UniProtKB/Swiss-Prot annotation:
Annotated region described as G3, given as residue ranges: 81-84
Main localization category: cytoplasm
Residue positions binding GTP: 19-26, 81-85, 136-139
Keywords: Cytoplasm, Elongation factor, GTP-binding, Hydrolase, Magnesium, Metal-binding, Nucleotide-binding, Protein biosynthesis
Record: residues binding Mg(2+): 26
Designated name of the protein: Elongation factor Tu
Chain spans, region G4: 136-139
Molecular function GO labels: GTP binding; GTPase activity; guanosine tetraphosphate binding; translation elongation factor activity
Task of the protein: GTP hydrolase that promotes the GTP-dependent binding of aminoacyl-tRNA to the A-site of ribosomes during protein biosynthesis.
Organism lineage: Bacteria, Pseudomonadati, Pseudomonadota, Alphaproteobacteria, Rickettsiales
Domain tr-type G: 10-204
Length: 394
């Protein structure tokens, strides 16, 4: 067969399987590839290939993640599956595997379990926009009333954590039957993929979002003015456009008078480009690493926020001891460290290495931020945690 595999003409979406241990996430992932392989939309991948997920490092944290790709009639998908619960927690908090949507796998025989709850909560906290449910192992349940009961429980749980529990598609099936090639098993997988296609919204492309570029370096070029360099995170910047410099100090307005890439002058820079941007009338000492250039009014500086954080274990090179209220580490946002103070919730005395927790942070200087922004927590230059901003408080 010719290697005319994935044409990139279809819109791309990142998804992942989440849910309690042993409810069938990896079997489902394998089943999707095997069923879609029949129509040429995937390379059939066996359970043990996915289960032996390689370790990856993301911001100093070791995470095991399996990646598979496949396509339906309408879309191309990159799908992540993690072998262990801790891998999910780390993955979702660090954003190592960006999820535009999730497939929540629940065993019909067991119903929602502790990690089912935790993954739904995490998905809400880190801003996974939508999810579809696969009620797995229905071949192990003889009683239709029990299936109905489990479905109701799942819907209530989703609503409790702020997802539209009444609207979310719940597909009932058996990943095992699909792996065995049974027609009813395959039918459920096809139904699931139709639901994923129609219910999980197409993500907004980075170039369609407002312009934002974290500043990495600042130079002054004699006779031309100040140039800041960095990688454009989102949007497009055109020569002549007004921009704001946000974070660390009061927000300033300036104008982009030139965009340079690989020493060539361009009319514009866009998401993903490493560029130098020439700023009109801005002095070298008025800009610094850690600020961002942004479309006016699109992002504001803040110093108080709530976060969901994973604290590295001792084995991962993290702290050996727990931390308590008023702990003051550095928070590394985009390109710079800012000191901040942690306030734990009233019912939590301490946070242990290897745990994840929700707490409030107050920084000594404001940073350009929006919900969903990722950061690292550092102590003396080493990473001790990773987090995501879940709510801005001022």
């Amino acid at each position: 067969m010719a290697k005319a595999k994935f044409e990139r003409t279809k819109p791309h979406v990142n998804i992942g399987t989440i849910g309690h241990v042993d409810h069938g996430k990896t079997s489902l992932t394998a089943a999707i590839t095997i069923v879609l392989a029949k129509t040429g939309g995937a390379q059939a991948t066996a359970y043990d290939q996915i289960d032996a997920a390689p370790e990856e490092k993301e911001r100093g944290i070791t995470i095991s993640t399996a990646h598979v790709e496949y396509e339906t009639k309408n879309r191309h998908y990159a799908h992540v599956d993690c072998p262990g619960h801790a891998d999910y927690v780390k993955n979702m908090i660090t954003g190592a595997a960006q999820m535009d949507g999730a497939i929540l796998v629940v065993s019909a025989a067991d119903g929602p379990m502790p990690q089912t709850r935790e993954h739904i909560l995490l998905a809400k906290q880190v801003g996974v926009p939508a999810m579809v449910v696969f009620l797995n192992k229905i071949d192990m349940v003889d009683d239709p009333d029990l299936l109905e009961l489990v479905e109701m429980e799942v819907r209530e749980l989703l609503s409790k954590y702020g997802f539209p529990g009444d609207e979310i598609p719940i597909i009932k099936g058996s990943a095992l039957q699909a792996l065995e090639g049974k027609p009813e098993g395959e039918k459920a997988i096809n139904e699931l993929m139709d639901a994923v296609d129609s219910y999980i919204p197409q993500p907004v492309r980075a170039t369609d979002k407002p312009f934002l570029m974290p500043i990495e370096d600042v130079f002054s070029i004699s006779g031309r003015g100040t140039v800041v360099t960095g990688r454009v995170e989102s949007g497009i910047i055109k020569v002549g456009e007004e921009i704001e410099i946000v974070g660390l100090k009061d927000t300033q307005k300036t104008t982009c008078t030139g965009v340079e890439m690989f020493r060539k002058l361009l009319d514009e820079g866009q998401a993903g480009d490493n560029v130098g941007i020439l700023l009109r009338g801005t002095k070298r000492e008025e800009v610094e690493r850690g600020q961002v250039l942004a479309k006016p009014g699109s992002i504001k500086p803040h110093d108080k926020f709530e976060a969901e954080v994973y604290v590295l274990s001792k084995e991962e090179g993290g702290r050996h001891t727990p931390f308590t209220n008023d702990y003051r580490p550095q928070f590394y946002f985009r390109t710079t460290d800012v000191t901040g103070t942690i306030k734990l919730p009233a019912d939590k005395q301490m946070v242990m290495p290897g745990d994840n927790a929700t707490f409030t942070v107050e920084l000594i200087k404001p940073i350009a931020m929006q919900e969903g922004l990722k950061f690292s927590i550092r102590e003396g230059g080493r990473t001790v945690g990773a987090g995501v901003v879940t709510k801005i408080n001022n």
